[in-house]
A protein has these predicted regions:
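Acidic/histidine-enriched alpha-helical segments
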Residues: 156
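An N-terminal domain-start capping segment
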Residues: 28-29, 215
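Oxidoreductase cofactor-interface core, primarily capturing Rossmann-like NAD(P)-dependent enzymes
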Residues: 5-7, 17-26, 33-152, 163-172, ...
């Protein structure tokens, strides 16, 4: 896992090279859902490029491709509470948002599985999604229920979302948030057949829901 920064690709490749030099040959890499379909988004393109490296460098690797993090809603919770608007453009196709707790548990399970394997396991990619496919209207309805006051969906305008994000993050990062949101609006972020069932089976429990986070943020 490496941060979304201007030198993210350098960080990823340096880390993998140093790991190989240290004799580490089993890794779990945190990529992003549909990394290969949104390569115009810089931090998606970086992760898609880095996904190629484990096999090239001879690692036994699991590549995790999580959907949009539910936890990122902390960045916009104040807007929801103070202005009664949910600002992220996610349209009517929906996004299978995922909780970071589920991501970390799946990552730990995969690290342990590879560590305990008698030999190198092949490179494998796992989509990590949440229990529900949520549209803008769905999310606004959850916030309405949790806060006890009507919350409107702000609409499918990535440009407005960029302007909002630029109030508390660097302009280049706010722009990335805009072009990241564009495929949410055009295509959604939809799980594939069997994704959810596989994830529930791995830790042996239900996945955390968006409503859990909304309840925590409402306080």
């Amino acid at each position: 896992m490496n941060a979304v920064t201007g030198d993210e690709f350098t960080q990823a490749l340096t880390t993998l090279n140093v790991a190989r030099q240290a004799g580490i040959d089993r890794v779990v890499y945190l990529s992003v859902f549909d990394a290969d379909k949104a390569v115009n988004v810089p931090h998606f393109a970086v992760k898609f490029g880095a996904e190629r490296m484990p096999e090239t460098l001879g690692f036994s690797a699991t590549i995790l491709r999580p959907a949009c993090f539910i936890d990122n809603e902390a960045m916009i919770a104040d807007v929801v509470r103070k202005h009664n608007v949910y600002p992220m453009p996610i349209d009517s196709r929906g996004v299978a948002m995922v909780d970071a707790r589920d991501i970390t548990e799946i990552a730990a399970i995969e690290l342990i599985r590879r560590d305990r394997a008698a030999g190198k396991l092949p490179v494998e990619t796992i989509n990590i999604v949440g229990p529900d496919i949520l549209t803008g209207a769905d999310v606004a309805a959850i916030w309405t229920e949790v806060l006890g006051s009507p919350i409107a969906y702000g609409g499918d305008a990535p440009g407005g979302f960029e302007a909002s994000m630029a109030n508390f993050m660097p302009e280049w990062m706010a722009y990335e948030m805009r072009i990241m949101a564009e495929p949410y609006v055009s295509d959604g972020m939809i799980l594939q057949e069997g994704d959810r069932e596989r994830l529930v089976k791995m830790p042996g429990r239900d996945l955390h829901s968006y409503r859990e986070t909304a309840l925590a943020q409402a306080g």
